């Protein structure tokens, strides 16, 4: 066990949020850190992750070498004139009735381009990002094969972590970065709390990759090589270039009130996928036909927690505010969390300060991150013609400024306020 008279921190979970936090603490503080990861090595599932301008700025603030390495491997729109565009939004299917079609609800109709501010947006392969993070961390920082079972908060004597393999570890505090199925969250909130476990959002998706040359042949260069969003009744599709422009990534979403399965991901057949999009326009149908075998990914989020901490236990990233992907900002919020918490912890001089530091972090992040969960669910309804209906003028108006509050955030102002409050509370 680690001696209790030394200030040291455990991070549970070696995903994007956990490793960004570990790098922050390595760069900003002298606090020893141990990362406990359930898997035999660092790694991430899922094809890609989106970072908006706010997240790109946070990555640069955490580590310029990380930003340079990730930036070299990031994917963006391939047309130079589209570098400032987040997504081009289009109608993906014909209107449900003659009135809708007369108003322009026709497959292929261009709605608008949503532009983003500098430093732009990145699409990054999750495993590439984790690889780059791991390279910048001391190799002896991680403990693998550690599945957390319990945390005992002993107050001034620290916390004791118990793992499935029977081992224990004592630290000054623990930060749970263990994702949407977070064991740390259930310990903090209690297993019976409705907010302790993931909630199905009424949406699911198929994911796949299409060779870029085939996509260009069917869609043309502009639509294949740049980020596109196709909207429709109870569904939408996103496409964007990955693998240095050699492939087009596809995420195809559908609405469904029920998810009767125990698992979040289940196998799907090509026939199921084609049936789900049978009444869509030619572009979307052609894309689905090009996709290979795909699983079905149910989309869950977390109901609001009253706080992201309890005593010497803190939550970060998806463990505190997992959201749907409809605004492309969930992973970015985890990076923001890591930067904010790292900056607050640089002012901690003794273990007794940690609960107050966690409280300051929770207050700084709660409103913004919960707003993401709520507005991301709303965005799913908007894209699926379930919020403004198929009124494309209202949808365009909603899109115009929808992302500004996410992208234009000055985190340093929140950090300054949090540190001031933390100092007063000590």
Could you describe each region identified by the protein language model?
Residues 26-47:
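Glycine-rich FAD pyrophosphate-binding loop
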Residues 45-136, 383:
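Active-site-adjacent segment of FAD-dependent monooxygenases/related oxidoreductases
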Residues 67-70, 95-97, 118-292, 305:
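Conserved FAD-binding catalytic core of PHBH/FMO-like flavoproteins
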Residues 3-10, 71, 78-80, 88-102, ...:
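C-terminal helical "tail/cap" subdomain of flavin- and related membrane-associated enzymes
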Residues 8, 32, 247:
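Residues at the starts of beta-strands that form the adenosine-phosphate
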Residues 42-43, 183-184, 322-324:
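Catalytic P-loop NTPase motifs of RecA-like helicase/translocase cores
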Residues 11-28, 36, 175-176, 206, ...:
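Conserved mid-domain beta->alpha element of the FAD-binding
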Residues 17, 41, 181:
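Conserved Rossmann-like nucleotide-cofactor binding loop
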């Amino acid at each position: 066990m680690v001696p209790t008279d030394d200030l040291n921190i455990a991070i549970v979970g070696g995903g994007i949020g956990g490793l960004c936090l570990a790098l922050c603490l390595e760069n900003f503080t002298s606090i020893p850190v141990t990362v406990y990861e359930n898997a035999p090595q660092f790694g991430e599932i899922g094809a890609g992750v989106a970072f908006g301008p706010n997240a790109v700025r946070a990555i640069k603030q955490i580590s310029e070498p990380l930003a340079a390495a990730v930036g070299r491997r990031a994917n963006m729109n391939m047309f130079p004139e589209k570098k400032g565009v987040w997504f081009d939004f289009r109608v993906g299917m014909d209107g449900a009735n003659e009135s809708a079609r007369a108003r322009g609800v026709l497959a292929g109709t261009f709605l608008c381009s949503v532009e983003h501010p500098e430093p732009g947006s990145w699409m990054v392969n999750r495993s590439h990002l984790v690889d780059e993070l791991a390279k910048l961390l001391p190799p002896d920082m991680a403990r693998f094969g550690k599945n957390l079972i319990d945390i005992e908060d002993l107050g001034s004597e620290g916390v004791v972590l118990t793992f499935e393999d029977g081992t224990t570890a004592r630290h000054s505090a623990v930060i749970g970065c263990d994702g949407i199925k977070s064991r740390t969250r259930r310990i903090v909130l209690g297993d019976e709390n409705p907010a302790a476990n993931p909630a199905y959002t009424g949406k699911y998706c198929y994911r796949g990759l299409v060779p870029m040359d085939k996509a260009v042949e069917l869609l043309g260069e502009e639509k294949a090589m740049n980020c596109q969003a196709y909207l429709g009744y109870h569904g939408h599709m996103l496409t964007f270039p990955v693998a240095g422009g050699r492939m087009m990534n596809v995420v195809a979403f559908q609405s469904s009130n029920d998810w009767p399965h125990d698992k979040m991901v289940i196998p799907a057949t090509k026939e199921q996928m084609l049936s789900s999009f049978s009444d869509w326009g030619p572009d979307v149908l052609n894309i689905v036909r090009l996709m290979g075998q795909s699983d079905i990914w149910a989309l869950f989020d977390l109901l609001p927690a009253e706080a992201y901490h309890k005593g010497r236990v803190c939550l970060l990233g998806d463990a505190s505010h997992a959201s749907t992907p409809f605004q492309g900002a969930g992973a970015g919020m985890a990076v923001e969390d890591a930067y904010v918490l790292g900056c607050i912890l640089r002012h901690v001089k003794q273990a007794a300060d940690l609960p107050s530091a966690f409280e300051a972090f929770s207050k700084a992040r709660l409103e913004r991150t919960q707003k993401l969960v709520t507005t991301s669910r709303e965005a799913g309804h908007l894209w699926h013609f379930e919020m403004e209906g198929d009124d494309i003028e209202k949808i365009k108006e909603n899109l115009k400024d929808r992302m500004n509050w996410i992208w234009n955030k000055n985190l340093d102002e929140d950090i300054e306020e949090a540190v001031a409050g933390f100092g007063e509370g000590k």
